[in-house]
């Protein structure tokens, strides 16, 4: 009984402590930090967003309206980007694969910001195949895998990200008639129960990866399907059926991304996924700075070359 009373008092103290307002607390002053952000896309005009990172009491960054933004291609000056409002600066240069791009930002009263990146090539997807019953989801349902074959160069450090739009529909036949159907569709950005060596090497289920351990010029990536989806069933009851016809489609999108884009996305993952030292109940979280390749400032200067392969249609009897 005595032990119960002590535990009750401790709980009461903990609750009252959590509800007590901290008086005379002042947030430390945060000097606005110049920030350069840009993700150049192959085939589109170059651009850059210049802002100032603010303190915790600011919801949005403050736009920089008076910057001089100079753009370089392969080490040669190309143009001065024009300000279009809200800190957005745009140019007329079209981003092209395998070219080096650099950006210099001059802001009165601050050190000059500088960043550079290389535009990757678009990935070449050579084949897409569906492997039935590759794994099972949390509810014990059989899930297919999407096998994506693509070309790469093992002699260069290359980086990729992918997403898969898919729809799977099952039609249950009885006496030659469809009596029930089920389906699910959506977009996949991760792989469940990951057993692909490249994804395992990344230590993440996200479809963000490098060719670090690939030794051949072509690789087949195995993505065990799972996605945020809309599902339905035309009937809520179950009867005997003669056969099932599976229909649907799979559309793979894959992008080549610059090294800076890859490391930034990786740092985002680390920020969003708690580690072993994180205890949200106690307010404990591991400090982490997002990756930045901007000299004298914050932000990321990256490049992406997206592609979408042909749609694969499914029409098979199981």
Question: Which residues does each PLM region occupy?
Answer:
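Sec-dependent N-terminal signal peptides
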Residues: 4-13
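C-terminal motif of bacterial Sec signal peptides marking the signal peptidase cleavage site
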Residues: 15-17
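A sequence/structural signal for flexible, mid-protein segments enriched
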Residues: 19-318
């Amino acid at each position: 009984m005595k032990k119960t009373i002590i535990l009750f008092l401790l709980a009461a103290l903990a609750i009252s402590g959590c509800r007590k307002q901290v008086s005379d607390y002042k947030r430390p002053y945060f000097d606005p930090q110049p920030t350069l952000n840009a993700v150049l896309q192959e085939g589109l005009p170059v651009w850059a967003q210049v802002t100032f990172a603010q303190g915790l009491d600011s919801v949005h960054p403050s736009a920089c309206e008076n910057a001089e933004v100079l753009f370089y291609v392969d080490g040669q000056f190309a143009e001065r980007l024009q300000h279009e409002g809200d800190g957005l600066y745009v140019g007329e240069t079209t981003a092209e694969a395998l070219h080096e791009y650099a950006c210099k930002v001059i802001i009165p009263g601050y050190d000059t910001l500088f960043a550079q990146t290389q535009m990757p090539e678009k990935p070449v997807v050579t084949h897409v195949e569906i492997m039935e019953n590759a794994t099972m989801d949390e509810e014990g349902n059989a899930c297919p895998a999407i096998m994506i074959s693509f070309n790469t160069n093992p002699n260069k450090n290359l980086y990729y990200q992918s997403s898969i739009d898919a729809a799977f529909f099952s039609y249950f036949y009885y006496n030659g008639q469809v009596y029930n159907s089920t389906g699910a569709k959506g977009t996949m950005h991760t792989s469940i129960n990951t057993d692909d060596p490249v994804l395992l090497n990344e230590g993440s289920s996200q479809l963000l990866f490098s060719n670090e351990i690939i030794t051949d010029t072509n690789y087949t990536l195995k993505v065990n399907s799972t996605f945020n989806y809309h599902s339905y069933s035309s009937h809520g009851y179950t009867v005997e059926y003669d056969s099932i016809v599976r229909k649907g489609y799979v559309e793979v999108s894959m992008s080549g991304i610059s090294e800076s884009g890859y490391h930034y996305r990786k740092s985002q993952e680390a920020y969003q996924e708690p580690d072993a030292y994180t205890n949200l109940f106690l307010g404990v979280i591991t400090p982490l700075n997002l990756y930045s390749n901007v000299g004298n400032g914050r932000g990321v200067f990256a490049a992406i070359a997206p592609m979408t392969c042909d749609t694969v249609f499914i029409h098979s009897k199981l």
